[in-house]
Amino acid sequence: MAGLLNFTWILALSIFALSLSAQAESVTDWGDVGRWKIRVDEDAGNGCFMETTVEDGTMIRFGYVPNRNGGFFAIYNSAWTDIVAGEKAKVTLEFDAKQFTGDAGNDARGGMPGGYAFFNNPNVRDEFSRSRTMIIFDENGHRIEVDLSGTSKAVQSVEACQKKQAE
């Protein structure tokens, strides 16, 4: 491993925000790139993000939060019933060459528990885009390995989407 990069994950959700997740999201579809859906979240300042669901039913989201000048990574799975809303957990994203570790706020989307982390380190996006594999694990024993094939093109599409939002 080329090194451990620690950066600040900013706890993105409060109890209030968790209650909002039960309401309908203000999200619209923008396009598709391979297995990734490109979407726009009005509540995040028209932030574009990519979303996919992998084999075990885990939903992964990655994108921009323009009204906070950063990005986010979120992951949800209906089997993770031990995740307690409002708490936070230490999460590590391990890419081909680097690791990023920080706190993620527990969240829920569509009835699925999971976590959401805001980041302002562009290296996270760069590694997500260029790596072939990502392993996500937390201090509670949740672990998932994700094939990132085709992700670079999806990240480019998210960036194009974000540029269109600024017009």
Regions of interest found by a model, annotated:
Residues 23-167:
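A generic "folded-domain core" signal
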Residues 1-5:
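N-terminal secretory signal peptides that target proteins for export/translocation
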Residues 8-19:
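Bacterial N-terminal signal peptides
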